[in-house]
Design a protein with these regions (language model features):
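A glycine- and small-aliphatic-rich helix-loop capping segment at beta-alpha/alpha-beta transitions
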Residues: 55-65, 79-84, 104, 108, ...
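Accessory alpha-helical/coil subdomains and C-terminal extensions
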Residues: 177-180, 202-283, 287
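Active-site segments that bind and position negatively charged phosphate/pyrophosphate groups
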Residues: 263-339, 347-348
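An N-terminal, well-structured beta->alpha segment
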Residues: 1-43, 51-52
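Short beta-strand segments
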Residues: 43-45, 67-70, 117-122, 181-187, ...
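Internal helix-turn-beta structural module
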Residues: 324-409
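Glycine-rich oxoanion-binding loops at beta->alpha junctions
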Residues: 70-112, 154, 158-159
Length: 409
């Protein structure tokens, strides 16, 4: 392993994530928060829910009650006046269903003088859920979507119609109270109704789109689920104010700044990366190989969210798969590619992403690993683990997509 490039990669990752932690962003958004005089209740859902709720309560001083539902391992302590719950992600589970019921109970019977402060971040689609189909069926549909290669907008178009809280329905539960929503974006282009499936946003998608997506990916659905896909979601809400804060562009900007501080010339390729993970990795590897050996320190940055079409039975995540796919192009070069999820988790693993450099492919061969067979089995985790290429950050408290960087010396 090229220890110099790995050290630079770790520093860039740390600086980038620190720049997009939600604490300051939530406080800025609350400058426009003006309760009407009644009760103020807090509901937070998503991978960054605890961090956002903690910042909000510190800024406000107190709330009259609250519920946080976040991913396992993401609650970092007690928040005064708020009950915190952990649940399953990316597949919803019974703990998430129960926590959502607690949130719904909290907002029942409110008046027009009351306010619900709704803090939303990526991961909310799985974590904040009251299914309209049996829980086991929803889990099965979620697994089908995850394995299909469907993008997040397609997935959430389906999930909205199978839920009693998504697609604007949570805001309807809160009425006549006002909902003040602060959203940390994890979807390219910041479509509010798709982030965590838009529990407090009118739905822009149509039932015809949902039915087409189900057909496109050959989803195995019950008659009940098919009937729900054919029903429309709320198209207008009059009790919601929404502010978006944080995005993948901020993550990319922070990464570029960190690269410059380490002496690299930074080039932002895109903040809308959306393709197969291994295609993105091969592309970044090819860019790095083209520019290696020219005597210039360069950093090529891409932010977004790739997808993985599961065909194998291995372990990994989109960022690990992206990194591993870059390894062949980097072989023998003084260059590296790394990719991380800003939330600190990549797929169903304990890693945030992966790192490879010009020495990785040879190290994999020595360990009895073939890059292409490993990718075909979707087993990037074990391959990178064998050569020290896993990136572990732990839960970060934020969630604004992924960032991938190619470094050239």
């Amino acid at each position: 392993m090229n220890t110099t490039l790995r050290r630079d990669a770790d520093e860039i990752i740390c600086s980038s994530i620190q720049a997009v932690l939600p604490d300051k962003a939530v406080c800025r958004a609350l400058e426009n928060f003006q309760p009407r005089g009644g009760r103020v209740l807090l509901v937070a859902a998503g991978k960054a829910a605890w961090q956002m709720a903690h910042a909000a309560v510190q800024a406000l001083g107190r709330v009259d009650g609250g519920v946080v539902v976040t991913k396992y391992g993401h609650v970092k302590g007690r928040i005064p006046g708020v009950n915190c719950y952990e649940a399953g992600h990316p597949v919803p589970d019974a703990n998430g269903f129960a926590a959502t019921e607690k949130a719904l109970a909290l907002v029942q019977g409110l008046t027009a003088e009351d306010t619900v402060l709704f803090l939303l971040s990526g991961g909310g689609s799985a974590l904040f859920e009251k299914p309209l189909v049996p829980g086991g069926e929803l889990q099965d549909i979620t697994n089908q979507l995850l394995a299909s290669g469907a993008d997040i907008v397609e997935m959430n178009t389906i999930r909205k119609r199978l839920s009693a809280v998504k697609g604007g329905r949570f805001a309807q539960h809160c009425a006549p109270a006002r909902v003040f929503s602060i959203v940390l974006s994890d979807i390219l282009g910041d479509p509010l109704d798709m982030i965590a499936s838009g529990p407090a946003v009118p739905d822009s998608s149509a039932c015809a789109q949902a039915l087409a997506i189900a057909e496109k990916y050959h989803l195995n659905l019950s008659e009940q689920a098919k009937a729900l896909l054919a029903q429309e979601t709320p198209k207008a809400l009059d009790n919601v104010t929404t502010q978006i804060t944080g995005s993948v562009r901020e993550l990319c900007t922070a990464a570029a700044k960190a690269c410059r501080e380490l002496g690299y010339e930074s080039i932002l390729l895109t903040d809308r990366l959306c393709c197969e993970a291994r295609e993105a990795g091969s592309f970044l590897g090819a860019i790095a190989r083209t520019h290696a050996g020219q005597g210039k320190k360069l950093a090529f940055i891409a932010g977004g969210e790739t997808v993985v079409h599961l065909t194998g039975k291995g372990l990994g995540g989109r960022n690990q798969e992206l990194a591993l796919a870059a390894a062949p192009a980097l072989a023998g070069q003084n260059a590296a590619v790394f990719s991380v999820g800003s939330d600190g988790t990549d797929g169903p693993t304990d890693a945030a992403g992966g790192y490879v450099d010009g020495e990785t492919e040879a190290a994999l061969r020595a360990a009895g690993r073939d890059v292409y067979r490993t990718l075909a089995d979707n087993d990037a985790y074990h391959a990178l683990q064998a050569v020290g290429g896993l990136i572990r950050t732990g839960a970060t408290g934020t969630n604004v997509n992924d960032v991938a960087v190619a470094l050239v010396e």
